[in-house]
Amino acid sequence: MVYESGFTTRRTYSSRPVTTSYAVTYPSVEKVTRVYKSSYPIYSSYSVPRRVYGATRVVTSPIRVVTSPARVVSRVIHSPSPVRVVRTTTRVISSPERTTYSYTTPSTYYSPSYLPSTYTSTYIPTSYTTYTPSYAYSPTTVTRVYAPRSSLSPLRITPSPVRVITSPVRSVPSYLKRLPPGYGARALTNYLNTEPFTTFSEETSRIRNRAQSLIRDLHTPVVRRARSCTPFPVTGYTYEPASQLALDAYVARVTNPVRHIAKEVHNISHYPRPAVKYVDAELDPNRPSRKFSAPRPLEDPLDVEAKEKQRLRQERLLTVNEEALDEVDLEKKRAQKADEAKRREERALKEERDRLTAEAEKQAAAKAKKAAEEAAKIAAEEALLAEAAAQKAAEEAKALKAAEDAAQKAAEEARLAEEAAAQKVAEEAAQKAAEEARLAEEAAAQKAAEEAAQKAAEEAALKAAEEARLAEEAAQKAAEEAALKAVEEARAAEEAAQKAAEEARVAEEARLEEEQRVREQELERLAEIEKESEGELARQAAELAEIARQESELAAQELQAIQKNENETSEPVVEEPVTPVEEQEPIIELGSNVTPTGGNSYEEDLDAEEEEDEEEEEE
């Protein structure tokens, strides 16, 4: 089984097809009577020969074939079992259900009568199987982005499909950490603390689900519909009422279903989710019995209060380069506003793109539907034409049959006349010998003409039947070609729509990559600004430390001078020279990199960078 962690205890890819359906077998008692009519004789291996008894003439009519196959219900019989697997990793969209039929060998019964010959064929279905194809993935699946608690903040940032590669903020010593947390750097810190791992894991699971669905579809056998074995066209259907036995069986299945737990568990084991219905539910880690494991809030109010006090204290202690900090705060706020405007623009573009895609799909579906309707209309017209041709052929066959009946009637009358003539010749044998010879010759000629007429009528009937069959086959072939053409046009329209959607997606990905590149450049620029500000703060701190050291040295020198003066006052007065000696003041040597303007250099750097940014925006 495959669980949420992605770990599997069996091979995910196997040559054995995955079972994703149920097979139900029920006896069917509903019947449909199909009548096959033909106006021409059907030649088969079993035929009834014409027998003549004495002077009696027997004429057989065309064979009438009557078949009575059992009715096959083309509806889906859902399993009454309460076992249902509804938790899947993908959405199920318009899963068509196919029904297959299997028939036993037809049983044929022959009538013992020879006038006319008939036979009956019955098809009894042994079972039928209904299955649902594998699950299909839809790109409309709602994507949920989860972030750890450590990355949450009061400012919510909408996740986007663009990957943002973040780097941790460089740590600085405590005495140089002048910038308080949450003051000015809140937007940038929250943006850099977002985790791209959730987006990556969502994309990985989506690709894995699509691959598994494709493998299941490849290994699922598609059972073809069983076709009828009779070569005769179906001309009509006769429906009989449903039997009470089927209704009783359905009620019994609903009220008292027969279940096989081991088999059901075996079937469920093929699904990518565990059978949570037959196992004990997982205990809630936050149940009342576990008081010690109660979830802690995201931010402790006491901790928040302490942080606020620390921030206020650092603000009071912050006395160096307040103007520079204001500039940094203004720059970061400007970057935050630009990012928010960019997100609003992306959201509007996404909505517009979704609307255009929906309209394109709707138009493609309408075109495909219209093409299918036109193809169906053309096929119906061709079928009507074929039916008219078949009716015309049937009328011609009927006319030929009437001609055959007239010929048979004439033959019967000739036979009666022949018998009367024979009787008359027997009575007047002595008187009309020459007349009898003439009548015999006329009777022979007339008989030959009757046989020739009968043979011609039979050949004409066979020819008309053959033409009708060819016309019907041509009509059926034309209808099938029209249906195939409509399906091909619909498929071409669908491929065109998919191609347009793919091109739109490629353009959108290119635009998103360009935006990602611009955003990364902006982040790098902000990081450089922050790095330069930290370097400037470190330099100023070093200068202050050097000034403090020099001041301490001056204070020590002054203290030594005062002590020396006090010692000199206690000694006798010594005459000083006439030329006064100038006292040299202590020289304070500063580094060459120290400037007298304090934070003005940092302000000049910021102004230069702002001017460069404005020039880039104008370009």
From Swiss-Prot:
This is Uncharacterized protein CG45076. Residues 602-619 have a biased composition (Acidic residues). Residues 570-581 have a biased composition (Low complexity). Keywords: Phosphoprotein. The keyword Iron does not apply. Residues 393-418, 425-441, 448-504 have a biased composition (Basic and acidic residues). PANTHER family: TRANSCRIPTION FACTOR HOXA13. Residues 285-304, 333-373, 389-504, 558-619 are annotated as: Disordered. The modification Phosphoserine is found at S79, S81.
